[in-house]
Regions:
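Short, Lys/Arg-enriched N-terminal segments with co-localized hydrophobic residues
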Residues: 1-9
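Accessory recognition modules or surfaces
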Residues: 11-19, 23-24, 48-61
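N-terminal Rossmann-like FAD-binding beta1-loop-alpha1 element of flavoenzymes
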Residues: 14-40
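Short beta-strand/turn micro-motifs composed of small residues
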Residues: 20, 43, 153-154
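Glycine-rich FAD pyrophosphate-binding loop
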Residues: 34-53
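Short, glycine/serine-rich, charged loops/turns that create anion-binding
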Residues: 46, 66, 156-157
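Glycine-rich active-site loop/strand segments that organize a redox cofactor
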Residues: 54-122
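Rossmann-like flavin
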Residues: 98-211
């Protein structure tokens, strides 16, 4: 027992470096400090000023469905051709992207999607308790809203939404489907372009991610 405790003490004196001062880097650093490690974060910018700056600030333990999935493949051509699409490429860079694109397509198979979603869910299911543990040590007055998060869609994207809903149901994710009337009751100022929706009542969002 004494040898084991000595080993733990030695491990806790180790110095750990973390690259990136976004929300993930900072949270990892804080948990390591709580375990007794000496931690240094490396980033050429101020904490929270790169990927974590200007994001939606969602606390989303339900977000276990990966981007790599079968239904995405059929949407790629229209994404590339649309000037307003979410996917844009520099055509002179396509050749360099081929290895990445091949890996992306290979991981769009259903068995790969299920494998990724399973382990993402196991990790994300622990996220809210982990955040709560850290937040006990800081003043969060007015910085976090506990109002849930709602998604809406049209019939045009119903097939993809059904895939997401069914996958989350299989993983045991808590979700509540909404009719157009229920969406209107929750958000009467939202233009009624939608045909359905889902709400995650336990989800949260940050009013100012950088300040947190």
């Amino acid at each position: 027992k004494n040898i084991f405790n000595y080993y733990l003490d030695m491990k806790r004196k180790e110095k750990i470096g973390i690259i990136g001062a976004g929300i993930q880097g900072v949270c990892n650093a804080l948990f390591l400090q709580k375990k007794g490690y000496e931690v240094t974060i490396f980033d050429k910018y101020e904490p929270g000023s790169s990927a974590s700056y200007g994001n939606a600030g969602h606390f989303s333990p339900y977000a276990s469905v990966p981007l790599n999935r079968p239904d995405v493949l059929s949407d790629v051509p229209s994404m590339l051709l649309s000037t307003r699409g979410p996917l844009a490429l520099k055509w002179n860079y396509v050749y360099k992207m081929l290895p990445w694109f091949y890996s992306f397509v290979k991981n769009c198979r259903e068995n790969k999607m299920m494998h990724t979603a399973k382990y993402m869910h196991q990790i994300l299911d622990l996220s809210l308790p982990a955040f709560d543990e850290l937040f006990e040590e800081i003043n969060l007055d007015g910085l976090i809203e506990h109002k849930g998060i709602m998604y809406v869609w049209t019939n045009k994207s119903q097939k993809s939404r059904d895939l997401e809903i069914n996958l989350r149901n299989n993983l045991g994710v808590k979700q509540r489907l909404l009719s157009p009337k229920e969406i209107h009751d929750l958000e009467p100022n939202l233009k009624p372009f939608y045909d359905g929706g889902v709400i995650y009542d336990y989800a949260r969002h940050a009013r100012n991610p950088k300040k947190i």
